[in-house]
Each structure stands twice: as C-alpha cells, then as structure tokens.
C-alpha cells in the first residue's frame, strides 16, 4: 500500500505519518519546508520521542518526501492508495489544487483503483471541507469520476504534539505524548476498509468528534487562557494551579453533560475520560506553552469551535455553563505579540466593547443572557 501525507510538521511526522509507516505502508511526505524535505530524503528516517510514564524513542524509517507545490506530488496522487493531511485547517484550501490536478492525471491514466483521502485536522469534518475545495478546482467533466473513485473520509484526531525542544539541532526529531486517537468514518471509504493499527473505524463519527472537541480542545484552550492570565508559562503549570484546574474540570463536566444528553455516552466512562485528559495536561515531559495553545482566539471563539459550540449545547438542553463562560471570558483577554488574531481581537474589543465584539465573533445574540454573563465574567477578570 502506498500513501501520500501532506504536512511534514510535528503532527505529520509524530502522529499520522508514524502510524502509516509503522503499518508497513510506503509513505511519502509532501511539504513546502525544504530543510525538512532535504533531511527526509537524505536519511529516509527520523526519531520520535514518546513521553509519558514510560519514555521511549521510536525510529520511523523507509519514508520519502516531495515538495507539495511541484509536479512530483501530482504524479504521486495518480498512483497512491491513500492520501492523508496534517497541514492545519487554513492550509487545506491551498493543497486542494494539487490534489485536483493529481486526480485528473489519475483519471487520464485510467487508474480506477479506489483512492481514499483523510484530512487529519483539528476541526469538525475537515475532509468534507477539503472535498469542497477539491471539487471547486475540478472541471465539471471530472467531478463524476472523482465521486465514483475517490473516498473523502472524515476523521477525529487526538494527540498532543508540542514543538520539539531539540528542533534547533535536528529538524526531524519530534516529541509526542503516549496517548493517541485516530477515529475515521468507515461509511465514507471507497473499496475495502484499510487495516491500519492505531486507526479506529466508526459509523458514528460525530459523537467522537464532539467528544474530543468538547473535552480535550475545550479543556486545553481554557487551561491556556486562564494560565496566560495567571502568568503561567506551560499547560502543566496552569493545570497544577488549583483555581484554574477547578474551572477547567468544571467546564469539561458542563460540556460533558451535553455529550451525555446528545449521544448517550456513559456518565462514569466520560468522567474517567475527563480525568485522563487532566492527566495528559499534567504530563511533565510535554513543554506545552500556553501561548501556543491559546493562539488564534478568533477561530476558537467562533460558533462551531471549542468554546461556543459546547456553550450552545448547554443552552439547547438547559444545562449549567458557568465555567464555560469563565473560559470564554479568559479567551477574550488573550493577548500575544506573536499572534495576529490576538491583536485583531484586542482591537475589536477596544473599538466595539466586549458585548458587541463577542457577539460578532461568536454569532451569539448581543442582547442574550449568556453574552451578558460572559461580559460580566470578562469585566471581573480585568
């Protein structure tokens, strides 16, 4: 089996690429970073530090790399069996034209073997969004062939992969936590279902997408925003602060009540899942910076993302949300010289005030009780 993976960054190398290579799949990375491409093609291997209770170093071998903006990547798309991505939500649109060209070439060469594409991004139904971008880049005459022969498979991914401390010395070395979860929608595949250790197949993906978004992502973001306000450097420092921990755990319990109501998750098992996530945040081997985790606050405060979406669920079911609101207020306070969205957020609040700014960013009604609650919490944490 041959696979092409877009995105040779930390998540690409430390998570999805590693699982594919470990499964014996012939793997080629596609990226724009020439330093990483050259290193991969010189060595065809790299090291992954897996950190947790038992630290180990795994070697991923037998890999190649191509530029994601050259002809080689188009040629590969015509022949591989699987395409995966870990490029970040914003970059999906940028790789779509190359994928479209490769699919046209595949059709022209008469390659009718099924191809499956899986976007492994921190977003809801990322592959469906990628499919939209690919279809927009195709001529009408090619769309029916693509619908017939190409599966666009949505997935939920979960593994904390912070920037590697040794990245200055070795561009390929990466550190990851022990925990990983890759859940894919088995109803969307074309052809036989793949057997890849570490890839879980489900016919109820949205339950797992929202479980991860409402728990890991919600908790991670709130830990970062409260941690930044309190002057903590890392997620571990922040979650060991009892005041922050109480709000984060409370927010995950509030979002969890929505999941239990919506999808019928077992309450005891979900409580254990929350505890496991708190333990992951405490991992002393992960130097996870609050500034990194908090970046892009406008996206994280948007209607379908990790703060507002669970809040909307609490409103839908008439459930408490006091800790989620505290997290939203902390997000509104996020400031970073390194992050354009943080600067845009600050400018918007200065220009319009917190009430109108939050309504504009989140889509919540400016005159609603919940916006008033968030503004009160925002003002209380100044």
From Swiss-Prot:
PROSITE patterns: MANNITOL_DHGENASE. It catalyses: D-mannitol 1-phosphate + NAD(+) = beta-D-fructose 6-phosphate + NADH + H(+). It comes from the Bacteria. GO terms for cellular component: cytosol. InterPro entries: 6-PGluconate_DH-like_C_sf, 6PGD_dom2, Mannitol_1_phos_5_DH, Mannitol_DH, Mannitol_DH_C, Mannitol_DH_CS, Mannitol_DH_N, NAD(P)-bd_dom_sf. NAD(+) binds at residues 3-14. Its EC number is 1.1.1.17. Gene3D superfamilies: N-(1-d-carboxylethyl)-l-norvaline Dehydrogenase, domain 2, NAD(P)-binding Rossmann-like Domain. One of its GO terms (molecular function) is mannitol-1-phosphate 5-dehydrogenase activity. The keyword Oxidoreductase applies. Keywords: NAD, Oxidoreductase. Pfam families: Mannitol_dh, Mannitol_dh_C. GO terms for biological process: mannitol catabolic process. Belongs to the mannitol dehydrogenase family. PANTHER family: ALTRONATE OXIDOREDUCTASE-RELATED (PTHR30524:SF0), MANNITOL-1-PHOSPHATE 5-DEHYDROGENASE (PTHR30524). NCBIfam families: PRK02318.1-2, PRK02318.1-3, PRK02318.1-4, PRK02318.2-2, PRK02318.2-5. This is Mannitol-1-phosphate 5-dehydrogenase. It comes from Salmonella typhi.
